[in-house]
């Protein structure tokens, strides 16, 4: 309600189309996975609001590896704690002003951590076919 008349802000509640998502200069979200897709494809930053995390594996800390969706937030944008919510506008403005820095940073990150960019479907399909062929061969040898 607060921003309904602000023409510079669009709040999306209908997710049947994602075209406008990728036109945005900045995404503000909580833990949504769309943040990574958005950042990787647009090289634009994400402002995360640090709401309580939905934990699928309550034992994750025993593994000793910080989950990807926690540490990656700091690589593709900024994180605001709930008690810092009043800093959202200022933080967003600073992030938009630094868009070139974020573009370079996200681009480097994608090159380092995203494999088979642009051909992952083909690579994945070939891998699955190879594994099926190996399983068939093992089955025939038994």
Region locations from a protein language model:
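Hydrophobic transmembrane alpha-helix bundles
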Residues: 13-24, 50-58, 139-142
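Catalytic binding pocket for nucleotide-activated donors in carbohydrate/polymer assembly enzymes
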Residues: 4, 33-113
